[in-house]
UniProtKB/Swiss-Prot annotation:
This is Chaperone protein DnaK. GO terms for molecular function: ATP binding; ATP-dependent protein folding chaperone; unfolded protein binding. Residues 602-638 are annotated as: Disordered. Keywords: ATP-binding, Chaperone, Nucleotide-binding, Phosphoprotein, Stress response. Acts as a chaperone. It comes from Methylobacterium radiotolerans (strain ATCC 27329 / DSM 1819 / JCM 2831 / NBRC 15690 / NCIMB 10815 / 0-1). Residues 622-631 have a biased composition (Acidic residues). Belongs to the heat shock protein 70 family.
């Protein structure tokens, strides 16, 4: 059995780790970094870039560079959060065939699961390169407050990337696993996780290797991206005030502003003031315009104060659901890049009444926890038991549009619960089961996860038939629902697939597409390598011909020139086999040059020796440093 890896699929950055013996290890990517930007881009010639290469070209290619895609995963196009996101990103968000939010580049639509799969593929390749063996299984993390559709879409992304997702694990729970792995202490901890796009808070009890989640809460549309956007809004408003030009319509300018905002935000975690300089940000008929202004930490904090305060209400709810007070929390663990902001640390300290624990790397701790869970599943990590919860209540729509809960939020998973319902009308021969997730009293105000029909109910007065509805939530937090007519034992079961969601056919198509892309990437890399090899050979041969061309017969020299010309012609095209063949031809033709070089060096050998001897005679005195070595020391060293 191959290694199971742990992946933190983040909104802004992703990270991969693996258990090496009893210790988790974060794996560096091909660029030597321990985290990889969750960014995917397509170039003019159709090449796909992932991670840092994609981020580097974002300013010049904003419409084909997809970032913060995790905010769209598992969401419908009509979701208010999708509509909000449309105004914040330079790329096109389009309606998928299934009604979900997809993205579009050059007329081709991609599902968020597909874009996320490209990042997961990069993580998979990073692990394979480090381990020296294929990787086919993974544990992937998601925000604790993700609903069923978002969890299912994340699992689909893993499948598209060629990974069997053994477990979907909540990010704060993963962080707690990493935090508590080597610590023998027990107690109640709060994990405050503010990442690039989502916020979660979980309350856990730890003791004797058992990690029990008591409650979780959060906001799947609150994170570092929102803090960046506040700076961008401030910069565009200030520029408009000064220059009278609206930069919000200029996608290139907006992308530059976004990069500058992220940089300023990071700098203000350690500095009290930063300067933002963007020369040639735009131009009008009077000439080019430059943006230059100072941003203080105090001003930044005032711009984002409401975002910081938005994290407190979920903390309050999580404590209430767990049945504990802030004073009963033994340790507060901070996770996610945004927790480096001093204001965040201050607010957390004020709310919980204690100094938060900063002993974990906020960018890597979630991936480390995922690797620990992978180790548990693989049997490498013993005596660790993880008991997670479902973040939202689950139920069905009943008469009058009421939301009837079958499983309450913060119920430990896996879990199974049944309830018996009946018909609303006389002689009703079918019922539609509509499954919802949320906390509102009316079904329509919650998230519709899916629906199905149970048909063939024998005619009977209303209220007589007995229909048993069973909810089954697995350890990934993914829901299965069964409806059964007790009179006939007729049963209908579905794995809840969001009203949109990807069908198996969609996933298969995307898997094939990903495999084809991987093959294309491999061919592109091979082409670059053989071209480099050919060009290096031409350079070396030309140099040798200049130096030793007069030492070889004219016929051999002519053959070398012909082979060189043929290789140069082949290098202008993209035929790998042709370039390889012409490279081999030139190598064989150049062998005569090698013989000439060797003969010339042999002939120069005696002369060179004579010169060296003459030189030695001229220099009668040789200066040298010397050191006396004790005989005993010499023996010791020997």
């Amino acid at each position: 059995m191959g290694k199971v890896i742990g992946i933190d699929l983040g909104t802004t950055n992703s990270c991969v780790a693996v258990m090496e013996g009893t210790q988790p290890k974060v794996i560096e990517n091909s660029e030597g970094a321990r985290t990889t930007p969750s960014i995917v881009a397509f170039t003019d010639d159709g090449e796909r870039l992932v991670g840092q290469p994609a981020k580097r070209q974002a300013v010049t290619n904003p419409e084909r560079t997809f970032f913060a895609i995790k905010r769209l995963i598992g969401r419908t196009y009509d979701d208010p959060m999708t509509q909000k996101d449309k105004g914040l990103v330079p790329y096109k968000i389009a309606r998928g065939d299934n009604g979900d939010a997809w993205v579009e580049a050059d007329g081709k639509k991609y599902s968020p699961s597909q874009i996320s799969a490209f990042t997961l593929q990069k993580m998979k390749e990073t692990a394979e390169s480090h381990l020296g063996q294929p990787v086919t299984q993974a544990v992937i993390t998601v925000p604790a407050y993700f609903n069923d559709a978002q969890r299912q879409a994340t699992k689909d992304a893993g499948k598209i990337a060629g990974l069997e997702v053994l477990r979907i694990i909540n990010e704060p729970t993963a962080a707690a696993l990493a935090y508590g792995l080597d610590k023998k202490k027990s107690g109640t901890i709060a994990v405050y996780d503010l990442g690039g796009g989502t916020f979660d808070v979980s309350i856990l009890e730890i003791g004797d290797g058992v990690f029990e989640v008591k409650s979780t809460n959060g906001d799947t549309f609150l994170g570092g991206e929102d803090f960046d956007n506040r700076i961008v809004e401030y910069l565009t408003a200030e520029f408009k005030k000064e220059q009278g030009i609206d930069l919000t319509k200029d996608k290139l300018a907006l992308q530059r502003l976004k990069e500058a905002a992220e940089k300023a935000k990071i700098e203000l975690s350690s500095a009290t003031q930063t300067e933002i300089n963007l020369p040639y940000i735009t131009a009008d008929n009077t000439g080019p315009k430059h943006l230059a202004l100072k941003l203080s930490r105090a001003k930044f904090e005032s711009l984002v104060d409401d975002l910081v305060q938005r994290t407190i209400e979920p903390c309050r709810k999580a404590l209430k659901d767990a049945g504990v007070s802030a004073s009963e929390i033994d340790e507060v663990v901070l996770v996610g890049g945004m927790i480096r902001m001093p204001k965040i640390q201050e607010v957390v300290k004020s709310f919980f009444g204690k100094e938060p624990h900063k002993g974990v790397n906020p960018d890597e701790v979630v991936a480390i926890g995922a690797a620990v869970q992978a180790g548990v599943l693989q049997g490498d990590v013993k005596d660790v038991l993880l008991l997670d919860v479902t973040p939202l209540s689950l139920g069905i729509e009943t008469l009058g549009g009421v939301f009837t809960r079958l499983i309450d939020r913060n119920t430990t998973i896996p879990t199974k619960k049944s309830q018996t319902f009946s018909t609303a009308e006389d002689n009703q021969n079918a019922v539609t089961i509509r499954v919802f997730q949320g906390e509102r009293e009316m079904a329509a105000d919650n998230k519709l996860l899916g629906q199905f029909d149970l048909v063939g109910i024998p005619p009977a007065p209303r209220g007589m038939p007995q229909i048993e509805v069973t909810f089954d939530i697995d350890a990934n937090g993914i829901v299965n629902v069964t409806a059964k007519d007790k009179a006939t034992n007729k049963e209908h079961q579905i794995r809840i697939q969001a009203s949109g969601g990807l069908s198996d056919a969609d996933i298969d198509r995307m898997v094939k597409d990903a495999e084809a892309n991987a093959e294309a990437d491999k061919k592109r890399r091979e082409l670059v390598e053989v071209k480099n090899q050919g060009e290096s050979l031409i350079h070396a041969t030309e140099k040798s011909v200049t130096e030793y061309g007069d030492k070889v017969p004219a016929a051999d020299k002519g053959a070398i020139e012909t082979a060189m010309t043929a290789l140069k012609t082949a290098l202008e095209g993209d035929d790998v086999e042709a370039i390889k063949a012409r490279t081999t031809d030139l190598m064989q033709a150049s062998m005569k040059l090698g013989e000439a070089m060797y003969a010339a060096n042999q002939a120069a050998g005696p002369d060179a020796g004579a010169e060296a001897a003459a030189s030695e005679k001229k220099d009668d005195v040789i200066d040298a440093d010397f050191q006396e070595v004790d005989e005993k020391d010499q023996k010791k060293r020997a």
